[in-house]
Amino acid sequence: MARLAGVDIPREKRVEVALTYIYGVGRTRALQTLRETEISGEIRVKDLTDEQLVSLRDYIEGNFKVEGDLRREVAADIRRKVEIGSYEGIRHRKGLPVRGQRTKTNARTRKGPKRTVAGKKKAR
């Protein structure tokens, strides 16, 4: 396995796909990186030369925030929103969807398992 940005990327996959294993690098950034470093996306990671690996590593670390730095920045942004009490921060604190999704039905991923509430009792 080759290491880029502190991540072991799979040797058997095409470079274009393997780069997406790095947090913060999706298909668009992977293609942009390959275009800038003039490496074919069709080549497998195991077939990359050392110079190509170094150029990929330098380009990614020089131009993008990836892995730990990006995770820290996202966490800090969320923490800041919670501290200032913005609408988004309140939604984060309550564990509800932040981006305006409906919650009357659905939103189970954020809300957790359904908590059943007892219905109305019958009068005797």
From Swiss-Prot:
Q: InterPro entries, from UniProt? A: Rbsml_uS13_C, Ribosomal_uS13, Ribosomal_uS13-like_H2TH, Ribosomal_uS13_bac-type, Ribosomal_uS13_CS
Q: What keyword terms does UniProt attach to this protein?
A: Ribonucleoprotein, Ribosomal protein, RNA-binding, rRNA-binding, tRNA-binding
Q: GO MF annotations for this entry?
A: rRNA binding; structural constituent of ribosome; tRNA binding
Q: Which PANTHER family is this protein grouped with?
A: 30S RIBOSOMAL PROTEIN S13/40S RIBOSOMAL PROTEIN S18, SMALL RIBOSOMAL SUBUNIT PROTEIN US13M
- What does the UniProt function comment say about this protein? Located at the top of the head of the 30S subunit, it contacts several helices of the 16S rRNA. In the 70S ribosome it contacts the 23S rRNA (bridge B1a) and protein L5 of the 50S subunit (bridge B1b), connecting the 2 subunits; these bridges are implicated in subunit movement. Contacts the tRNAs in the A and P-sites.
Q: What GO CC terms are in its UniProt record? A: cytosol; small ribosomal subunit
Q: Which Pfam families match?
A: Ribosomal_S13
Which family, according to UniProt?
Answer: Belongs to the universal ribosomal protein uS13 family.
Can you say what this protein is called?
Answer: Small ribosomal subunit protein uS13
Q: What does the subunit section of this Swiss-Prot or TrEMBL entry state?
A: Part of the 30S ribosomal subunit. Forms a loose heterodimer with protein S19. Forms two bridges to the 50S subunit in the 70S ribosome.
Region annotated Disordered, chain positions: 95-124
Which GO annotations describe the biological process of this protein?
translation
- Name the HAMAP family on file: Ribosomal_uS13
